[in-house]
Amino acid sequence: MEIFITGLLLGASLLLSIGPQNVLVIKQGIKREGLIAVLLVCLISDVFLFIAGTLGVDLLSNAAPIVLDIMRWGGIAYLLWFAVMAAKDAMTNKVEAPQIIEETEPTVPDDTPLGGSAVATDTRNRVRVEVSVDKQRVWVKPMLMAIVLTWLNPNAYLDAFVFIGGVGAQYGDTGRWIFAAGAFAASLIWFPLVGFGAAALSRPLSSPKVWRWINVVVAVVMTALAIKLMLMG
């Protein structure tokens, strides 16, 4: 149980920093749009990354130690780029805050042709079908963005191999899997908490002023994480 708790705490410490995934989860929670798809991508990705990190850390560090350095510097570049984008958004006069998706009843024009009760009903049905199709597709873009921000983020591999795999390796063959399970438990708690919490607070969090400050915090945290990675070398 102690190993599990240690993994849980390490996983939580990695998640507490405002990273690209967290920002996306918050934004989609505020929009109430594609949140479940984003959460599933984040959680399923963590399963594969933690398994890869637990299995591959010894092989990678012994066979190709330079790969860890490449991932570290790639993570630094990625974090600095994300920090610059957040700072740019914070400094612009018009900050684009996520908008809440309101559900509205489709309307039919008043000039419906005579005898148009059936026509109006048919029109409403067609509009409802179109709205339903749009709602079905609305999760695709956030899901693809979650995949990109997870799997093209060098820092994700660094966390999986160096922190989850590297620290977990000291607990032996069985203990490292318990450690990884604890780290995943942190993800299982964190992502839904952040996403649904953002949805519950969507109205105050939709303010451009609030998002200007969020972008400032994101820029500072991303820069601090990049500096921390530099010092690890």
Curated annotation (Swiss-Prot):
It is a multi-pass membrane protein. Pfam families: LysE (PF01810). It comes from the Bacteria. Keywords: Amino-acid transport, Cell inner membrane, Cell membrane, Membrane, Transmembrane, Transmembrane helix, Transport. Residues 1-2, 87-143, 198-212 are cytoplasmic. The keyword Nucleotide-binding does not apply. Induction: Positively regulated by LysG. Transport process is modulated by three forces: the membrane potential, the chemical potential of lysine, and the proton gradient. Strongly inhibited by CCCP and valinomycin. GO terms for molecular function: amino acid transmembrane transporter activity. The keyword Transmembrane helix applies. It is found in: Cell inner membrane. The chain crosses the membrane at residues 3-23, 66-86, 144-164, 177-197, 213-233. Its main location: membrane. Residues 24-65, 165-176 are periplasmic. Disruption phenotype: Null mutant is unable to excrete L-lysine. Deletion of lysEG decreases the extracellular accumulation of L-lysine, L-arginine and L-citrulline. GO terms for cellular component: plasma membrane. Catalyzes the efflux of L-lysine. Can also export L-arginine and L-citrulline. The lysEG system prevents bacteriostasis due to elevated L-lysine or L-arginine concentrations that arise during growth in the presence of peptides or in mutants possessing a deregulated biosynthesis pathway. In vitro, can also export D-lysine during biotechnological production of D-amino acids. PANTHER family: ARGININE EXPORTER PROTEIN ARGO, ARGININE EXPORTER PROTEIN ARGO-RELATED. Belongs to the LysE/ArgO transporter (TC 2.A.75) family. This is Lysine exporter LysE. It comes from Corynebacterium glutamicum (strain ATCC 13032 / DSM 20300 / JCM 1318 / BCRC 11384 / CCUG 27702 / LMG 3730 / NBRC 12168 / NCIMB 10025 / NRRL B-2784 / 534).
